[in-house]
């Protein structure tokens, strides 16, 4: 006789456990599941739990050599999505033992690495994760965080101002440095390499770093303020990336930059550790995020990528602008902005927050509002994002008809006016345009 009956097994027999009581140490996931026609939601949810943890399509002999009850993922709750046909929110609990300590790479490889191509599912989206404090404590997190950054820069009580240098490609290193100097001298706190500025034939990284450092120190001497330029250290290998970060540190600049999705979480975590050890701030760009998060029923919501970045490490991350979007999108965006900044966040489905999240004092990340914004958006941005943010105007600075420095002056004056008006009790949503007009006189 044989020990078990071979053949295809229903996942729900093992992995659908609606009576399961989640543990404080479990990683919890909320998936938006669209099953194939004829596949019950319980089977689809159990399949997700199985294929992202211990399961395969049949019973295997080696199942008897371990404790599946200890290590398996469990689909513990399913709810239909209101207003959507054949879509369900499936909740899965994963035992903490399944994950390597301090590795976002391993966490994602387990939870989303294989299951998204599963035949029983028409579409699958990871909406949110609850990361338990026991796992968070295995990560360094951001190199410095919001308060330490403010102390390093000696800038308090207002959002920070930035500018992406344009045109993003084609400038020589010296002309690039000139634009950096003009913007910083005009009143900005930071300027920025674009995400695809690495080390191309028209401007090699070392030349850019040297001219930008010169611009930073000249602007600091003239304004009496601490300035920075996000020097993009992203490279083709981790070794080259660290080499660029080392050179930035040797120049004495305050901040470097990384494209964390195209560069990868392993590289990003290595760079974040280097930055903390060597006193560098780390700006994070989310290039490639829309490939993952744009579809509403498949992929991964950006709030998951934002949580992962806080664990992997970064002091700033691009987070959208909200301005001009629908109210619902505003609430969703502010939901993950607060996930980046706050120490504890309550579950709030209206803001897209599926679980309570406690960060056990891990430093926060400054959200960066960037993309298509200009001086007339300043009142709304100041009101929506508050002081702990970076407002980044590329064309909104360099597009000023009088030049780069006047563009920077306009942004700084508008920001100072909006902050002062807010502190004096004005309603920025109602009076914002009048405040900007009066400031322009």
UniProtKB/Swiss-Prot annotation:
Catalyzed chemical reaction(s): 2 (2R)-3-phosphoglycerate + 2 H(+) = D-ribulose 1,5-bisphosphate + CO2 + H2O; D-ribulose 1,5-bisphosphate + O2 = 2-phosphoglycolate + (2R)-3-phosphoglycerate + 2 H(+)
Subcellular location field: Plastid, Chloroplast
Residues involved in substrate binding: 114, 164, 168, 286, 318, 370
Cofactor(s) listed in the protein's UniProt record: Mg(2+)
One Gene Ontology CC term in the entry: chloroplast
Predominant localisation class: plastid
Subunit annotation: Heterohexadecamer of 8 large chains and 8 small chains; disulfide-linked. The disulfide link is formed within the large subunit homodimers.
Protein family per UniProt: Belongs to the RuBisCO large chain family. Type I subfamily.
Function text: RuBisCO catalyzes two reactions: the carboxylation of D-ribulose 1,5-bisphosphate, the primary event in carbon dioxide fixation, as well as the oxidative fragmentation of the pentose substrate in the photorespiration process. Both reactions occur simultaneously and in competition at the same active site.
Protein name: Ribulose bisphosphate carboxylase large chain
Gene: rbcL
């Amino acid at each position: 006789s044989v020990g078990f009956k071979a053949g295809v097994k229903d996942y729900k027999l093992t992995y659908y456990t609606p009576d399961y009581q989640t543990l404080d140490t479990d990683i919890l996931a909320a998936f938006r599941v669209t099953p194939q026609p004829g596949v019950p939601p319980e089977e689809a949810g159990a399949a997700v739990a199985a294929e992202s943890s211990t399961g395969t399509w049949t019973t295997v002999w080696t199942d008897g050599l371990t404790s599946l009850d200890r290590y398996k993922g469990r689909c513990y709750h399913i709810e239909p999505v209101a207003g959507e046909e054949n879509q369900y929110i499936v909740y899965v609990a994963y035992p903490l033992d399944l994950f390597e300590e301090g590795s976002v790479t391993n966490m994602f490889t387990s939870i989303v690495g294989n299951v998204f191509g599963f035949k029983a599912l028409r579409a699958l989206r990871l909406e949110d994760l609850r990361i338990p404090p026991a796992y968070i404590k295995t990560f360094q997190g951001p190199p410095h965080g919001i308060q330490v950054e403010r102390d390093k820069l000696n800038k308090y009580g207002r959002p920070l101002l930035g500018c992406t240098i344009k045109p993003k490609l084609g400038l020589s290193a010296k002309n690039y440095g000139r634009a950096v100097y003009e913007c910083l001298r005009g009143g900005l706190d930071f300027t920025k390499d674009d995400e695809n500025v690495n080390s191309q034939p028209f401007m090699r990284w070392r030349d850019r770093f040297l001219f930008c450092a010169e611009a930073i120190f000249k602007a600091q001497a003239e304004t009496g303020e601490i300035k920075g330029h996000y020097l993009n250290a992203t490279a083709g290998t981790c070794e080259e990336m660290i080499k660029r970060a080392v050179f930035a540190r040797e120049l004495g600049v305050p901040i470097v930059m990384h494209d964390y999705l195209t560069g990868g979480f392993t590289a990003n975590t290595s760079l974040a550790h280097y930055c903390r050890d060597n006193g560098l701030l780390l700006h994070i760009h989310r290039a490639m995020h829309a490939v993952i998060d744009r579809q509403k029923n498949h992929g991964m919501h950006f709030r998951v990528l934002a949580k992962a970045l806080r664990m992997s490490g970064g002091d700033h991350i691009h987070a959208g602008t909200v301005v001009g979007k629908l109210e619902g999108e505003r609430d969703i965006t502010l939901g993950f902005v607060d996930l980046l900044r706050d120490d504890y966040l309550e579950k709030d489905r209206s803001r897209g927050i599926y679980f309570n999240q406690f960060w056990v004092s891990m430093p926060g990340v400054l959200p960066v509002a960037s993309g298509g914004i200009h001086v007339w958006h300043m009142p709304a941005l100041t009101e929506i994002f508050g002081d702990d943010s970076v407002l980044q105007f590329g064309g909104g600075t360099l597009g000023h008809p009088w030049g780069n420095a006047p563009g920077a002056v306009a942004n700084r004056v508008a920001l100072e006016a909006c902050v002062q008006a807010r502190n004096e009790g004005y309603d920025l949503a109602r009076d914002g345009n009048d405040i900007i007009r009066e400031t322009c006189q």
